[in-house]
């Protein structure tokens, strides 16, 4: 009898390695699928490990460029910070992983997809909603959520089935990383009063250890897309990874955040996102230079909403599609170069230029070259203040009598 095929989102870690064996024992033929979205995974090692622990097939996909161009770029152009602080690191990669899982499932004729999320986090929602949006007919299984084992029980199961237990299993932190940044939780970080230890960080240095000399970078954008760093053209993925190194060594992009999770609890998260913070700041400055006032004032409303829909696992929803369409329509004239100083945890914009700049120095100056017609201000003020003046005149005639 042919076994039912299931595609597992495989990381190479303990949870998903145990999940392979558990699914095999449950009667499935397991096909492992692992993506590299910029965290520097050893895909060859992970591919072999999946087969070793029981998968019949193992897919490894280098998805860095697709992640950068189709997902991180949207977050950049949306200046996406969930609750004003979190630049959607993990939330951005989940829809791409779900998309690839569905593609492999279709290719292999699988009837189900499995993931390694617990029942306590946001990722279970993101994966399952995305999978159902792309393939409503596929079943979704969550072994880790279903078996409800303790960590000790999971380790014992692994040892009984000769599943390699990672040497860093005693790492107190739960870490997720992609090219847009690194997230860290658990361990001592669960106490919101505790100062995060330096061991919690990897992409950034402390302010005390940051250089005493700044780095100056120039980032050039074409239609809102970063295309070069310091005059060197490079792919978006490489630009982000390069900027992570440069900004990270200056301690840029450390975020300590109490976060309202989708599942209803608060969590304490520590993030590192040096490139994301730097690029968002630079992009915002270029928009300030090239946007008309009305678009500049309205776009933050869209930014807040798209941050929420992405965080809440609704990437493949009609609302997100509509929000992204608006976003892209605003980027046509976001062209130019931004100069940023990176120093002691700060990304400071020091210069900006654009062929589409709406800044007119002759209108802004207070020198003799001023071309602004100040006489026009009199009529403008009369019309602009007319509703306020009429309201004051009407209401000043109303006598309010208060009985004591």
Curated annotation (Swiss-Prot):
ATP-binding keyword on record: yes
Keyword set, alphabetical order: Amino-acid biosynthesis, Arginine biosynthesis, ATP-binding, Cytoplasm, Ligase, Nucleotide-binding
Residues reported in the UniProt entry to bind L-aspartate: 118, 122-123
Pathway: Amino-acid biosynthesis; L-arginine biosynthesis; L-arginine from L-ornithine and carbamoyl phosphate: step 2/3
Cited Pfam families: Arginosuc_syn_C, Arginosuc_synth
Subunit relationships: Homotetramer.
Primary location: cytoplasm
Residues where L-citrulline binds: 86, 122, 126, 174, 183, 259, 271
Record EC number: 6.3.4.5
Domain of life: Bacteria
Entry's family note: Belongs to the argininosuccinate synthase family. Type 1 subfamily.
Catalytic activity: L-citrulline + L-aspartate + ATP = 2-(N(omega)-L-arginino)succinate + AMP + diphosphate + H(+)
Cellular localisation: Cytoplasm
UniProt GO BP: argininosuccinate metabolic process; L-arginine biosynthetic process; urea cycle
Protein name: Argininosuccinate synthase
GO cellular component, one term: cytoplasm
